[in-house]
């Protein structure tokens, strides 16, 4: 197993390559300790910063970054950190040519080619290629959620999930769809959205072969085969496979009819009933003129019982 120093270097690279996010109580060797130090998400090789703190006056960390103010105990650590601003990536993989800003990151990346997984979970024996991945995995066993949102108090086990959640409060959406321009707060949300353009359906049902673009859609579909109905009505106890079906059913108890018809004022409990009703209005009010062949509608005051076979233009000629 790699030494403790190598594990610390890989954890530092994990933060610098993918996300720089320190929460109060966490501290890496030689780095300033902040409640929220910095959030760095790769968006077209640009940096997105959030809640940038003022540097500490701690004499134990005299080397401050001129770009963001973060302080370090060693000049060499500052030099490594500076690459997050300059974009310099001097360490190249001999297998695929991919470049990295830290040597430890190249070492960790090399395991994707060799298949080496030196970090093993003592709980379930699952193995990982990076110490940080093992540390995140172990929180599934311990239930630890060290990342707390200062806005709503919600806690997260992974810094990446916490960073994405913060954008709910800030409104930041750095991931834009190249096809339609729609922006998203997380890369995973963008990846799911892009399937609406590509038509990709990577999730297949093992029972019937039906494919889905979203894993959540597959999970819902599976209930057709398993008969699972996890959503229970609190009033009558009836169970449903989908939350939307439960919401529609609940209106039989509350009497709510949220879909009003603008033509006649009648209200409906289900959207499907409302749509069917609207089509009935359209059929009654749409006619083909016997004179010119164009379709036309009757005035709102007219009824289906007194239609005319000619449009107003032909009728007046």
UniProtKB/Swiss-Prot annotation:
Gene3D superfamilies: Classic Zinc Finger
PROSITE patterns from the UniProt entry: ZINC_FINGER_C2H2_1, ZINC_FINGER_C2H2_2
Key words, A-Z: DNA-binding, Isopeptide bond, Metal-binding, Nucleus, Repeat, Transcription, Transcription regulation, Ubl conjugation, Zinc, Zinc-finger
Subcellular location: Nucleus
Pfam family, one: zf-C2H2
Main location: nucleus
Domain of life: Eukaryota
Crosslinked residue numbers (Glycyl lysine isopeptide (Lys-Gly) (interchain with G-Cter in SUMO2)): 33
Classification via InterPro entries: Znf_C2H2_sf (IPR036236), Znf_C2H2_type (IPR013087)
Recorded family membership: Belongs to the krueppel C2H2-type zinc-finger protein family.
Role played: May be involved in transcriptional regulation.
Record protein name field: Zinc finger protein 771
């Amino acid at each position: 197993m790699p030494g403790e120093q190598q594990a610390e270097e890989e954890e530092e690279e994990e933060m610098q390559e993918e996300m720089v996010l320190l929460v109060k109580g966490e501290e890496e060797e030689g780095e300033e300790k902040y409640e929220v130090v910095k959030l760095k998400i790769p968006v077209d090789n640009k940096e997105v910063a959030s809640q940038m703190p003022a540097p500490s006056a701690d004499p134990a960390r005299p080397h401050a970054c001129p770009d963001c103010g973060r302080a370090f105990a060693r000049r060499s650590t500052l030099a490594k950190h500076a690459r997050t601003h300059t974009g310099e990536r001097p360490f190249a993989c001999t297998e695929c040519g991919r470049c990295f800003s830290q040597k430890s990151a190249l070492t960790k990346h090399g395991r994707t080619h060799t298949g080496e997984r030196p970090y093993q979970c003592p709980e379930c024996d699952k193995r990982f290629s990076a110490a940080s991945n093992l540390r995140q995995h172990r929180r599934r066993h311990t239930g630890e959620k060290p990342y707390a949102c200062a806005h709503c108090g919600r806690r997260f086990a992974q810094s990446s999930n916490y960073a994405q959640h913060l954008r709910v409060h800030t409104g930041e959406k750095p991931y834009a769809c190249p096809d339609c321009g729609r922006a998203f707060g997380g890369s995973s949300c963008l990846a799911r959205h892009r399937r609406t353009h590509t038509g990709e359906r990577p999730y297949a049902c093992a029972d019937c072969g039906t494919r889905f673009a979203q894993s959540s859609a597959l999970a819902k579909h599976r209930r057709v085969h398993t008969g699972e109905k996890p959503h229970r009505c609190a009033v009558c106890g009836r169970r449903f496979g989908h939350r939307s079906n439960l919401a529609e059913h609940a209106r039989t108890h509350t009497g709510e009819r949220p879909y009003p018809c603008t033509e006649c004022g009648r209200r409906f409990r289900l959207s499907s009933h409302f749509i069917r009703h609207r089509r009935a209005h359209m059929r009654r009010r749409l006619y083909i003129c016997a004179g010119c062949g164009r379709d036309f509608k009757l005035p709102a005051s007219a009824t289906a019982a007194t239609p005319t076979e000619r449009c107003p233009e032909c009728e007046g000629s």
